[in-house]
């Protein structure tokens, strides 16, 4: 992948930064994207009179994060038209309508979109469709930072991660903790952890962990892990129901968030698992404990539960669907999964009144030293066979120590 300050800045501030650059990267991006956006605009009103229809088609059909007209709002109509004119290119007629305003407008009535008549009209969705990406444009965040935000909606707290790949750091945990605290304080119905991104969360930001090693600040790392664990316990022990709505990848620390919620409402396109062993680490946000509890609940056999947890965590097993997640004890019978992600936020909000808080659990009965030695022997044999690396063995020994 090409890395540059320009591309890093574009990811943070939007595509307009890239397109306004007159270097080779910017010129290439402009040449390609301007053609696509002009073509999209030329389809109105022949294909549809509503720009939102084209944006939806590109997002749902081609997995775009933003549609053409949402991108044009980010780029700026005036800049886009001026540059087309400067290059002697044809400006689609629809772009010349109501030049002073964006295609999308957030009002007290809800999100509106510009029509070919030059007048805004409400975006209408079926009753079951609720998108946070649209909803939040009409709401004010109760608390927000660069990586996460939370909103109050329908007497509920809705938490959104919005960092790159929704990687978690201290800022993410601050918002999550504040949402749970404020929801209890205000007497809200509960907390929903959700976002409209491609992935729920790809785990803890390894860059922030790496930084601790590079500057030899191990206390900072300890403080972060303590903050992570305490936030997970705060969610689990809250008097209010906490529901997670995973889509795409929920792995590593992102899956630890899911594990500590009272109910999981997953998309059929969900990938879950504790994958830290794949990068030579151990899950440190409480995930090991939760997986061990889940296997005990599922099997009622402490030795087999410990062995299954050892294999799950040590091998970094992934569930590539909710059905696989159930087999790996990643989800409970009370959890559910749904095909249409546009319905999931509404389902989660409705479920808050029906969710049963996970009761206080008895301490786990651990299997002890003999079982630990059996796991160490398994690791040694597989190291000799060349199936594990020496560091795999090191990680595996620590996982075995935890689950026994």
Regions picked out by a protein language model, each given a short descriptive name:
Residues 1-191, 195-198, 207-227, 233-239, ...:
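N-terminal glycine-rich phosphate-binding loop for ADP-containing cofactors
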Residues 256:
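Short alpha-helical segment that forms part of, or immediately flanks, the ligand-binding pocket
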């Amino acid at each position: 992948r090409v890395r540059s300050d320009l591309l890093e800045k574009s990811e943070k501030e939007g595509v307009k930064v890239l397109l306004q650059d007159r270097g080779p990267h910017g010129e290439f991006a402009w040449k390609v994207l301007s053609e696509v956006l002009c073509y999209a605009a030329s389809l109105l009103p022949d294909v549809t009179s509503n720009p939102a229809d084209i944006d939806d088609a590109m997002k749902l059909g081609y997995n775009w994060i933003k549609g053409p007209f949402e991108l044009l709002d980010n780029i700026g109509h005036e800049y886009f038209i001026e540059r087309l004119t400067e290059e002697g290119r044809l400006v689609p007629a629809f772009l010349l309508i109501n030049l002073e305003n964006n295609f999308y407008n957030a009002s007290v009535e809800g999100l509106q979109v510009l029509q070919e008549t030059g007048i805004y009209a409400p975006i209408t969705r079926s009753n079951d469709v609720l998108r946070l990406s649209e909803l939040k444009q009409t709401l004010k965040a109760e608390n927000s930072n660069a990586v996460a935000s939370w909103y109050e909606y329908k007497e509920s707290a809705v938490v959104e991660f919005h960092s790159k790949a929704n990687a978690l750091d201290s800022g993410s945990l601050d918002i999550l903790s504040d949402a749970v605290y404020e929801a209890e304080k205000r007497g809200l119905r509960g907390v929903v952890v959700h976002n409209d991104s491609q992935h729920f969360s790809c785990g803890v930001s390894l860059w922030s962990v790496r930084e601790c090693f590079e500057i030899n600040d191990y206390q900072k790392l300890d403080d972060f892990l303590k903050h992570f664990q305490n936030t997970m316990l705060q969610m689990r022990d809250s008097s209010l129901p906490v529901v997670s709505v995973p889509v795409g990848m929920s792995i590593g620390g992102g899956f630890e968030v899911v594990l500590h919620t009272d109910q999981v409402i997953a998309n059929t396109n969900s990938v879950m698992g504790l994958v830290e062993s794949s990068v030579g680490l151990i899950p440190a946000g409480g995930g090991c404990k939760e997986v061990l509890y889940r296997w005990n609940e599922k099997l009622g056999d402490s030795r087999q539960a410990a062995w299954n947890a050892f294999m799950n965590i040590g091998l970094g097993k992934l569930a590539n669907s909710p059905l696989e997640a159930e087999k790996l004890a990643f989800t409970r019978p009370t959890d559910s999964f749904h095909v249409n992600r546009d319905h999931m936020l509404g389902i989660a909000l409705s479920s808050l009144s029906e969710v049963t808080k996970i009761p206080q659990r008895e301490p786990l009965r651990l299997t002890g030293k003999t079982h630990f030695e059996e796991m160490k022997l398994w690791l040694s044999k597989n190291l000799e066979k060349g199936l594990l690396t020496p560091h795999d063995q090191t990680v595996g020994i620590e996982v075995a120590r935890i689950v026994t």
